[in-house]
């Protein structure tokens, strides 16, 4: 079978809600990375067979945001593109679709990843197309409804985390401690420049003066403590334990990579970073969607012909501390190998981009000692996706 390799992998910094990227459309963040990958690899843009990009909150951006990103990123109009929505798994699903298209011989080179600007998601006035006869009407927050609400139970994703708290007996202190650890690891990695190789700075024009260059993730917080987090009120349930401090944020960002057949990489003298070994997807009861990575990880390992003990590093999306703790309990993961640079609680969770972001961060950790990695994300609606990669040899 054709070996599929990852030949370049980058991401933007992750902006906080209403932060540095609030006026930068998702497709511009994606275009920045496409342009950078073409320049970095020296690849002829016309040799790219397809562009596949995850993007969840598409309303108001225009037709097919992936196509917009591709064209604005400098690709010729002959290169097709399409947009993927698998909620939080969109970015990783895009990479899986690229992988599948190469294995089947349809493509040789694909740009794949994810992008999201949650700050720019619009408010909607449903059923207003043909007017209202009388009475008050309300607006729907497209970010909350299309991105963060379990449509089957009509409640926020945070309630699914509270359901896992009850099922697994997870305490508030455990969640806050997990969140503090995530922040501390991210602070350390940021201060040591460990994200520098994976981040492409984004220049933001200003009405007056020089452009602002965004180089670092905005959500990383120093001086976070369990004591400080314990003062926060429950965010989703009156007597709950899930708070803004032990959950991922609302964020903006993008991540992208060059997916190729090994033969094409050799032909073009492009040195790959890693080999895609296999993927797994799984579904569970939507009310406990956060536990779905367990099944996805098991399937990805089986398809990759690997055991959990073969994995040197894990990048698992931290939708909620409670969700992450539940998955850890089921899989019995070695904590020293999981999210060693911090996770989404600290770095952020731009939903359409996160699937690609966790893989980008994982790829930049591979070396002679860390040869195999696994990444996974839970997905609203009761799903999860996972992937296994190995350092290219």
Swiss-Prot record:
Can you tell which superkingdom this protein's organism belongs to? Answer: Bacteria
Q: Which reaction does it catalyse?
A: 2 acetyl-CoA = acetoacetyl-CoA + CoA
- Report the principal subcellular site: cytoplasm
Positions of transmembrane segments: none
Q: Enzyme class, one word?
A: transferase
The enzyme's E.C. designation: 2.3.1.9
GO CC list:
cytoplasm
Pfam families cross-referenced by the UniProt entry: Thiolase_C (PF02803), Thiolase_N (PF00108)
Q: Which residues of this protein are catalytic?
A: 88, 349, 378
Record keywords, A-Z: Acyltransferase, Cytoplasm, Transferase
Localization? Cytoplasm
Residue ranges of coiled coil: none
Molecular-function annotations in GO: acetyl-CoA C-acetyltransferase activity
Similarity comment: family membership: Belongs to the thiolase-like superfamily. Thiolase family.
Name assigned to this protein:
Probable acetyl-CoA acyltransferase
* Organism for this UniProt entry: Staphylococcus aureus (strain MSSA476)
